Amino acid sequence: MPPSIYPNSINPNSTNRDTTHPATVAIAGGGLAGLAAGCALAEAGFRVTLFERRPYLGGRASSYQHPGTGEVVDNCQHVLLGCCTNLLDFYRRAGVLDRIRWYKKLTFLEPGGRASVIAPSALPAPLHTALAFLRADCLSFRDKLAIGRAMAALAPSTPADRGESFLDWLKRHGQTEQAIERFWKTILVSALNEDLDCVSVPYAAQVVRESFLKSAAAGLMGIPTVPLTDLYSTAGDYIRARGGEIQLRAGVELFRSEISEVSVTTNGQEQKFDYLVLAVPFDVLGRMLPDTPSAAPLAAALGQFSTSPITGIHLWFDRQISDLDHAVLLDRTMQWMFHKSRLITARENEARENDNGGGSYVELVVSCSRGLIEKSKSEIVDMAVKESREFFPGARGAKLLKSTVIKEVHATYSPRPGIDQYRPKPETAWPRVFLAGDWTATGWPATMEGAVRSGYLAAEALARFAGGKSVSFLVSDLAASGLMRLFGGKNQSAYAPFSLFAP
């Protein structure tokens, strides 16, 4: 274990307290950003206390026992890609890499069930998926030519944010209507949780370059094989094993920063720490800020953010409806299918088969689901079942046993043009207080990778202030391969997911 950092022995801003004890850090928020910061700081020798208002860890990437169905459900399906180097590093720390199943193939389904499979070939990047695109029935040859031209424009570098939406960029680069609907919209709305006419060009380009162009390894898709809370509860164990503490059902309501300490109020009680990381959503942070001149610039920046929703529809059928683990769904409201009864671990799968007679449990996901927010659960379930039967012939004779709908109304921030100028760095007006969250200045959009990066960046900033020296937790990006190296690929990351791929 790295040596402990005792900031008061070397920091000119420190107090005169006993330096034989590790510095204490409060972390407000038990989502990925807070957990990543907590794990990094605990590893560096800080005494971490993490506060989470819910009875479980994971934030928006969590699961719980649904009272209406009696089933453990994820609030929404989360996936990762091989390019998510910091998320993979976080999973390594938490010891859960073996709970991710990796896939090379991405199946696009049309209504009626016709499938087009995108998978890498032996060709060098960025051409490794070109053969699969040429064979894809869901796109015409004209669509494919248009997509190829746009990919060629994005390959050399990520365009700057000039206030243009990615939809306008696509039209300016000659994209067909079907190429936009069946490729660009399908991929990017799911990745960025926003409509293309509200997405900034740099973030759309980043998703395309990182996941489709950089290398075959970068585009591998990983899906958890356990409920999400099981994935992240081990991060709490990691913090506890290093002398830290996790307080659940204990959200931070207020904070106060002094010269030598910070205090937080949770459940009406005040506790004092040396440092504080605020790893909460931007709207929650806005309600916590003091009404002082020093807080005004941050409050003004937070006022520039807006959110976009995600909806997950969970369906239990009396029989298997598909032999696919997951699929992209085209031309309908439902966007992705995740066959949860095929994805979960063998032990849990056996238990479910005993309870369910070998039926199917699927989750359908709708990103940027503003059109569903005002609809009732029954309306959404009826739509989901109807569309499932269009895509999966096995669902046409299947009986729906139970269902539930989970709406994350404020799931992510909207990555609209110009938003980057308002995304704050981890340092704040209060020297002992730091920010984390996927909405902060990470260089990534609102993804699990962005959340973990924000936690690591906050931990680095705190450790620098505490110890007066540079501490690095952030992992390098995945290296470009093949021809993409001609465009200035970055250094190979400390961790690559090749060994994790499950065929």
Name each region found by the language model.
Residues 191-192, 382-428, 480-481:
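Flavin (FAD/FMN) cofactor-binding core of flavoprotein oxidoreductases
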Residues 87-93, 97-205, 216-218:
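Mobile amphipathic helical/loop "lid" adjacent to a hydrophobic cofactor/ligand pocket
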Residues 463-503:
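Active-site-proximal substrate-binding core of FAD-dependent oxidoreductases
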Residues 23-50:
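N-terminal Rossmann-like FAD-binding beta1-loop-alpha1 element of flavoenzymes
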Residues 42-67:
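Glycine-rich FAD pyrophosphate-binding loop
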Residues 20-21, 44, 250-395, 491-503:
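Mid-domain catalytic core of redox enzymes
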Residues 343-350, 408-435, 439-442:
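FAD-binding beta-loop-beta segment adjacent to the flavin cofactor pocket
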Residues 205-267, 271, 275:
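Helical element adjacent to the flavin cofactor pocket in flavoenzyme catalytic cores
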